[in-house]
């Protein structure tokens, strides 16, 4: 039987259902809004298990957003999915350099991916940034190299690329390196929609 629900109540009801289906699972209160938003976006309850957080990662992200940090993504899809109205009200904006002609030319000349070079370009930004990576493992590898060389210190690193080639390994590189606060989806799952959802979970906490 179909459930009657007013349009403005659908999202709230969805989160009620998510909470019900999680049952007696104990989620860290700081991380729960991010986990539930990822589940809401994907209808995949595996995120209750595979999202891992460095200590106080969400709080660190919230503080950075309140201070007006920018967000860097590795896809236009993730950029499109982030709530730019809230972000702009806090003084931030979203960047994606993947389609920039100079990035494409540099990547071709060096024989590396555009994702790799786009992270190098992002490292030149003057503002603190949250990096939301939902597609390219090489973006994570590039970020790790930049951090190791002390050329970059992300305010928060969201590592949720999806796929098969170097996906698991690149995520573990971020976790094991511990060079920046992180939220990582262990395993092969993730995606640009999940990267955007994690950003939005924090933005909505600020503007709820």
Please give the residue ranges for each predicted region.
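Charged, compositionally biased N-terminal leader segments and the immediate start
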Residues: 1-29
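N-terminal glycine-rich anion-binding loops that anchor highly charged ligand groups
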Residues: 26-40
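A short, well-structured juxtamembrane/interface segment
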Residues: 49-64
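Buried hydrophobic positions in well-ordered alpha/beta secondary-structure cores of metabolic enzymes
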Residues: 74, 157-159, 198
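Short glycine/serine/threonine-rich phosphate/pyrophosphate-binding segments
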Residues: 78-81, 138-143, 164-168, 191-195
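Long, charge-dense
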Residues: 87-125
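C-terminal functional extensions of proteins
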Residues: 165-208
């Amino acid at each position: 039987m179909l459930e009657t629900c007013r349009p403005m109540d659908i999202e709230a009801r969805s989160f009620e259902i998510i909470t019900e289906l999680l049952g007696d699972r104990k989620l860290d209160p700081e991380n729960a809004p991010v986990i539930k938003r990822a589940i809401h976006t994907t209808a995949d309850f595996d995120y209750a298990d595979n999202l891992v957080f460095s200590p106080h990662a969400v709080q660190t992200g919230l503080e950075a957003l309140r201070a007006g940090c920018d967000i860097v993504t590795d896809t236009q899809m993730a950029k499109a999915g982030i709530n730019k109205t809230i972000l702009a009200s806090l003084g931030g904006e979203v960047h994606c350099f993947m389609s920039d002609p100079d990035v494409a030319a540099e990547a071709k000349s060096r024989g590396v991916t555009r994702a790799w070079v786009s992270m190098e370009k992002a490292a030149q930004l003057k503002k603190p940034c949250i990096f939301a990576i939902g597609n390219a493992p090489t973006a994570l590898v590039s970020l790790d190299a930049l951090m190791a060389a002390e050329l970059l210190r992300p305010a928060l690193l969201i590592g949720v690329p999806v796929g098969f080639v170097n996906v698991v390994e690149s995520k573990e590189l971020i976790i094991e390196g511990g060079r920046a606060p992180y939220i990582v989806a262990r395993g092969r799952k993730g995606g640009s929609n999940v990267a955007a959802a994690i950003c939005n979970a924090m933005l909505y906490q600020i503007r709820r």
